[in-house]
Amino acid sequence: MGIKRYKPTSPGRRGMTVSDFAEITKFEPEKSLTEPLKKHAGRNNHGHITTRHRGGGHKRRYRLIDFKRKKFDIPAKVAGIEYDPNRSANIALLHYTDGEKRYIIAPLGLKVGDTLMAGPNAEIRVGNALPLANIPIGSQIHNIELTPGRGGQLVRSAGNTAQLMAREGNYATVRLPSGEMRMVHIKCMATLGQVGNVDHQNIMIGKAGRSRWLGRRPVVRGSAMNPVDHPHGGGEGRAPTGMNPKTKWGKPAMGKKTRHNPRTQRFIVRTRKQK
């Protein structure tokens, strides 16, 4: 993938970059693998905002992605690489020899015409999915399950990759992109290779309107609000907050640990903060 730059014909164009979509080979989605995607603008079933700064954006259809890769020992040919508006990674359309079609996250280096397979007996090559018990130590992997059969939950966004570091007993140790070292059951599936579309992180949005196309609404600083709206609000002119950073609801912000899951804490060998 390459980056396309625009001439500075306007302040919004200056610095704006887009993907050149060189990897994309198919421009219309497989209709049988899509479904309507209703917009909620960050609201829950009561109509209350639970996620701020969401709303608007271009209409989308959801692409049904196969995160489980449970069609074992059935070869599939890559029919196309497509853009997916619902995620940063591109997706690949697979045509299985039994006639079924499925989408997967497109790994780096996958090309149209490649043959992929999933299962314990699959070949060690990019795009194939195997249990962690059957993947060589040191391999780059993505789309990693946390619970066997549940489907990939970790390392799914553009350019990301994890590394299989060790295996001991029923657990494998995986180094995640954040630097965290985590134990995952060896029956969990993972896909070989790195997620494609690696230049996604280098794209410059360029102007506010382009964020609105993506469904992102403006973010207002607390210090620019009134005291009734935010703990940082009020004062004459640009006033200091006079306190440790707080959220809009008075909770500690910036640096406060928010992880509260002691059940899975024992699976974390090293946190992302430890060196």
From Swiss-Prot:
The keyword Ribosomal protein applies. One of its GO terms (cellular component) is large ribosomal subunit. Residues 39-59, 254-275 have a biased composition (Basic residues). GO terms for biological process: cytoplasmic translation. Residues 38-59, 222-275 are annotated as: Disordered. GO terms for molecular function: rRNA binding; structural constituent of ribosome; transferase activity. Keywords: Ribonucleoprotein, Ribosomal protein, RNA-binding, rRNA-binding. Pfam families: Ribosomal_L2 (PF00181), Ribosomal_L2_C (PF03947). It comes from the Bacteria. One of the primary rRNA binding proteins. Required for association of the 30S and 50S subunits to form the 70S ribosome, for tRNA binding and peptide bond formation. It has been suggested to have peptidyltransferase activity; this is somewhat controversial. Makes several contacts with the 16S rRNA in the 70S ribosome. Belongs to the universal ribosomal protein uL2 family. Part of the 50S ribosomal subunit. Forms a bridge to the 30S subunit in the 70S ribosome. This is Large ribosomal subunit protein uL2. The lineage of its organism: Bacteria, Bacillati, Chloroflexota, Chloroflexia, Herpetosiphonales. The gene is rplB.
